[in-house]
């Protein structure tokens, strides 16, 4: 597409191999076309509002970034076998969100993983539950929690704790109604999965791409934004395999 002069919107990940990604980005740079990578969660109104609080300095210096991402049901083992694994398929969104929220690069990861949801995923060579610790170049720390199955729905939350305050984005629910009675508190479960949860974000990211092309402006999610989470994911895989922290620059 780049050689043909076509502007590109590419879903994540661009590829699973950093060499292939770097070669593709070189072609994009050479051709002068526009490339946007599909990290739609950046365009979620809630997460974007948290990022704006960080970028404006309202929270001071970021100290701790916490991201919770849990799917409502695990994928088939056949899908897992060809997806590149949990870190490259699922957590890659969270690695991007960590960069987006912090405004800095991840320098080190320490990943813990287990098979607690579906034994078939383990037989396919992957994990279904993970906790990943992050270190950022700007001194902040991060925690990502992942599970392939949350029985109550699609659990998508972020929190940034800074020197001047904290900003949180909670789950979206069908309604904001809360019932209080003698049995306790009742409220809606989170929206079931990504199509419902991120409907506005999908529309907003495509509009941003169209606007960038029409107005000849830089796209809001660059090729490097597509490469960086892949490097973090590969470092997380190495960390899980070796049982120790891994520098992202080693990938």
For each feature predicted by the language model, list its residue ranges.
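NAD(P)-dinucleotide binding in Rossmann-like oxidoreductases
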Residues: 115, 120-126, 137-204, 222
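Beta-strand-loop-alpha-helix segment that lines the small-molecule cofactor/substrate pocket
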Residues: 1-42, 57
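C-terminal helix-rich "cap/oligomerization" subdomain common to oxidoreductases
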Residues: 22, 30, 137, 208-251
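Hydrophobic residues in well-ordered beta-strands that form the structural core
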Residues: 9-10, 35-37, 66, 144, ...
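A general structural signal for well-ordered alpha-helical segments in protein cores
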Residues: 21, 47, 94-95, 177, ...
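Hydrophobic/anchoring residues in structured secondary elements
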Residues: 64-67, 111
